[in-house]
Amino acid sequence: MIRFITIPDFADYQVTLKLMEDYVNKVISDHEPEIIYLVEHLEVYTAGTNYKQEELLNYGDIPVIYTGRGGKFTFHGPGQRVIYPILNLASPNRHKDLKLYIKMLEEWIINSLNYFGIKAYIIKDKVGIWVKVRKDEFAKIAAIGVRVRKWVTYHGVAINISTDLSKFSGIIPCGLENSLVTSLNQLGIHVEMSEFDKIIQTEFNKIFK
């Protein structure tokens, strides 16, 4: 059984990044067990390896961190559950297949949202998890950006629970101009973070056996 570790309070992004990277090194060199960090960050904009500077619009006094994960700009802050799985894809019960790993992440989050009555989708050529908000119009509810070192995964998924969605106006989220973002709260689903965490742990064990 993989251990889920909840980081208390609001976590500084750079401190958490170092925590992840240090543990990845331990998994690689010392064969430490797989773990998953559950985090709620202080406000921060992060840029993945495919970012374009013009996609950073008006960040005000919110810090901007340039990371090594895949993807473009996104926002992290209170009310958002960020999940950092540190999994060894080279282990006998996993697969050395990054596309399969991302597909499993998507299925995991879609199933977790479905528990709360939210029908979520993946959309071709648009990374992340989406929900239909109006006829033929979708909004992103979860962002995905991962990195792998020697087949050990880090970074992960950010799901908007009760996030201040106005903060996304400081960027072009994930490089998708005019795209909408949403949250469980905005969809009328009010859930405590601890309750959400229980469901994602249950659903994880169904997908990542």
From Swiss-Prot:
It is an enzyme of class 2 (transferase). Transmembrane segments: none annotated. GO terms for biological process: protein modification process. It holds the Pfam family LplA-B_cat. Residues 30-209 form the BPL/LPL catalytic domain. Pathway: Protein modification; protein lipoylation via endogenous pathway; protein N(6)-(lipoyl)lysine from octanoyl-[acyl-carrier-protein]: step 1/2. Its EC number is 2.3.1.181. GO terms for molecular function: lipoyl(octanoyl) transferase activity. GO terms for cellular component: cytoplasm. It is found in: Cytoplasm. In the reaction, the free carboxyl group of octanoic acid is attached via an amide linkage to the epsilon-amino group of a specific lysine residue of lipoyl domains of lipoate-dependent enzymes. Catalyzes the transfer of endogenously produced octanoic acid from octanoyl-acyl-carrier-protein onto the lipoyl domains of lipoate-dependent enzymes. Lipoyl-ACP can also act as a substrate although octanoyl-ACP is likely to be the physiological substrate. This is Octanoyltransferase. It comes from Rickettsia africae (strain ESF-5). The gene is lipB.
